[in-house]
């Protein structure tokens, strides 16, 4: 017998395939405060027991592979393996289970969302023994949270920078999203900002196309910001989209924005990637720029109920990677978002501490310790009639963004902005006076419209517009 064979025998190596559950299903395991905990919605293939499916998820997203390997004997699997420690059937669903998996913290590189996701939502999602797999939630331990910078500035610092308190912030996405020249684009920004909005925004598609190169857009938008600030006496901003084909080009655009003295830049964090996003976030913190985050591509990942990843996980990942704003759905507009579920991950974005609450889709209690909060952005198919509901649902720490609801005003961009600002101020005043926005919302808007012809015109245009489809994202 060769020395190598003797060595393998001495560590108890036995070639072949064995059930995952023999190693990775550990219902007796007591989770540690330092474990990353994951809740997976697992749909096994017919004939695969839930214990084997849950153990397979734990194995394939940590130390396991399809067969025994002799190098297992060179390390401590008990220290590094993921463990499926609990399985619950999903009410009302046949052959679907919530499998809870605990991962030791040593499996992950410090300060890297990229590395965390490569393991937890990596190849396991293509595993043949599973019909479908969805990551519903993650518990990020405090020990891991503290390895991240998080948002560049956070909610309070942003309010101090802008000198705006006691109300939601107002924004507008410039439309048409593609095709305008840089000068016309800047003019549209100026009209919206002078009318009363706090921000205007590049659409997520706007990078540096032939019809409008990024440098020209940045210059004309900066002119719009400074001109509107001089006229209104308020601090204004435009989300200059720095997303680019390379990290180097992205940072170059952010540097130019800083040189122009504008307050905020923007990034498409899913299409751009978490490595790029974290790099940009760190640059923004070091150089005093706010960072607006768009979630383009999220519905490819989170829309299906039984496969992919819930947006609350993407929201937590963004808070780690860094961003001061992120789009979160509206509940009342044209884009997906059920109220309790949406408010669940909005709290995960803003609050220091969020209790487990399955009725809102929150599977784990989450502490963010001193990580700054992120402002949720409500955007997509909203207009002045939605203002009471938006104010009541999202509260002051939010950004309400009206694209078509500003630019579609029959009198132009500036009157559209005036209408939104008047509607918002009326709703905030009514709320502060103790009125019920949910019940009296339409009355509040009508009363304000008597004193604002711009608001009255907006009310008339959008009085019949509704987006009433059932939400896909339900418990």
UniProtKB/Swiss-Prot annotation:
Record note on modification: The disulfide bond which can form in the large chain dimeric partners within the hexadecamer appears to be associated with oxidative stress and protein turnover.
Gene3D superfamilies: Ribulose bisphosphate carboxylase, large subunit, C-terminal domain, RuBisCO large subunit, N-terminal domain
Active site: 175, 294
Chief site of localization: plastid
Keywords carried by this UniProt record: Acetylation, Calvin cycle, Carbon dioxide fixation, Chloroplast, Disulfide bond, Lyase, Magnesium, Metal-binding, Methylation, Monooxygenase, Oxidoreductase, Photorespiration, Photosynthesis, Plastid
Function: RuBisCO catalyzes two reactions: the carboxylation of D-ribulose 1,5-bisphosphate, the primary event in carbon dioxide fixation, as well as the oxidative fragmentation of the pentose substrate in the photorespiration process. Both reactions occur simultaneously and in competition at the same active site.
Subunit structure: Heterohexadecamer of 8 large chains and 8 small chains; disulfide-linked. The disulfide link is formed within the large subunit homodimers.
Comment field (misc): The basic functional RuBisCO is composed of a large chain homodimer in a 'head-to-tail' conformation. In form I RuBisCO this homodimer is arranged in a barrel-like tetramer with the small subunits forming a tetrameric 'cap' on each end of the 'barrel'.
UniProt protein name: Ribulose bisphosphate carboxylase large chain
